[in-house]
From Swiss-Prot:
UniProt pathway annotation: Secondary metabolite biosynthesis
EC nos: 1.-.-.-
Residues engaged in binding FAD: 34, 45, 119, 328, 341
Full protein name: FAD-dependent monooxygenase nscC
Organism, as annotated: Aspergillus fumigatus (strain ATCC MYA-4609 / CBS 101355 / FGSC A1100 / Af293)
Length: 408
């Protein structure tokens, strides 16, 4: 791997920036290309599991957890640490059902992280600034391992040692290198809303339920309505909500199952959603924000729930084309359960580590070593995430039965 051609990373999300930061910290040249502008918004929060943030902090030089939470926690501006209580609430009665593993000595500490803040924090964890070039939407990938060429829609061309595909579930790189791998649509309905409210209103309406927790996880009879803090200041709280359930029947007669909506149409609030929310008989605080009048003042999106699975042979074939995959480009999974961001971090850490460890050897072998670790880990997670969707959208009778067995 004597060549000083840079590694070309397509996508400035969590996986791409993690890869770039660790390669840069190891002295390996790389450039990150991002289709959107620097001010793109993706300010919702994600759950970082203990195994995910532990390996990240270790890879960045054994940083303390407080360094991470001070930089990324949704409530960092008021001294919070992104803590969540993991409690499950009945959204029809506003009563707490249970706390998973409440009395377990091995209960996992989950940290909530604002996505924008996490990207900035990762990018800043090193002495040398990352080379991130915005406004570069990929058009073409050509060549082979050791000498790849990429062309962008703005007319720019670059040569590199290899390409890292960090460009998400609808990966342009994957569509060209592994065209037969298509995202699978999970038969689920998911609407996501964002809103802001004064801090005093948050303290009055949510604090009695959440305390210091950054999530209020509400479940109903086969549907979910979690609230989450995205960002909190002394005066205002930016929050989001989700409304999700399995598709009814085959989906053909389900007015809310619309997996192939155009992006502009996905931002419109359908009458069927308003009617369905009204039929749910929600308790406060859910009823105050999930109603036809309130959501007209929110930014509401219809999200298609998709996942991506690949074979080990697919990945090896891509190596010959000079491409390695990280993040959702090769293991997109439903958001329920909070694993996707953690595997994106792990990918970046493991790929950068394999490349650095094999810096004096064969690059193809180094990438193969990465997949020896990452393929089973990530593909097992895709399978788990699909199963978890149905577990998290069970009938209320099952939730109440569970609550009898688990402590508050």
């Amino acid at each position: 791997m004597a060549s000083r051609l840079p590694i070309l990373i397509i996508g400035a999300g969590i996986s791409g920036l993690t890869t770039a930061r660790l390669l840069t910290n190891s002295g390996i040249p790389n450039i990150v290309f991002e289709a959107s502008s620097p001010d793109r918004r993706q300010g919702f929060a994600i759950s970082l599991r203990e195994w995910g943030y532990t390996i990240l902090l270790s890879a960045l030089g054994d940083l303390p957890l407080r360094s991470l939470t001070r930089g990324v926690a949704p409530d960092r501006e008021i001294g919070g640490s992104g803590w969540i209580d993991q409690a499950v609430w009945d959204n029809g009665t506003a009563k707490k059902l249970f706390v998973p593993d409440a009395n377990s000595s091995t209960k996992e500490l989950i940290v909530r992280a604002n996505r924008n803040a996490l990207r900035r924090w990762i990018a800043d964890c090193g002495e040398e600034e990352l080379d991130v070039r915005y406004g570069h939407r990929l058009k073409r990938v050509e060549g082979s391992l050791g000498d790849v060429r990429v062309e962008f829609e703005n007319g720019a061309f670059y040569r590199g040692l290899m390409v890292v595909a960090a460009d998400g579930v609808n990966s342009t790189v994957r569509s060209q290198v592994l065209a037969h791998v298509q995202p699978e649509t999970v038969p689920a309905v998911l609407y996501h809303g964002e809103f802001q409210l004064p801090r005093a209103d948050f303290d009055r309406l949510f604090r009695p339920h959440t305390g210091e927790s950054n999530i209020l996880a509400g479940v109903g009879d086969g549907f979910n309505t979690p609230f989450a803090v995205c960002n909190m200041t002394k005066t205002h709280v930016h929050m989001d909500w989700s409304y999700s359930r399995p598709v009814r029947g085959s989906g053909e007669d389900d007015p809310l199952y619309r997996p192939n909506l155009a992006s502009e149409e996905a931002k419109r609030i359908p009458t069927a959603l308003v009617e369905e929310l009204a039929s749910r008989d929600l308790a406060e605080p859910w009823s105050l924000f999930l109603n036809g009048e309130a959501i007209q003042h929110h930014r509401v999106f219809h999200w298609a729930v998709r996942c991506v699975s690949v074979t080990r042979e697919d990945m090896q074939r891509a190596v010959g084309r000079g491409v390695a995959f990280v993040g959702d480009s090769w293991h997109a999974m439903p958001i329920f359960g909070g694993e996707g961001g953690n595997h994106a971090l792990a990918d970046g850490i493991e790929l950068a580590g394999a490349i650095a460890a094999g810096a004096t050897g064969d690059l193809g072998t180094a990438i193969g070593n990465y997949y020896d670790q990452a393929w089973k880990r990530s593909q097992d997670a895709v399978r788990r995430s699909k199963q978890r969707f149905y577990t998290l959208h069970r009938p209320m009778a099952e939730w109440r039965e569970l609550s009898k067995k688990k402590p508050l």
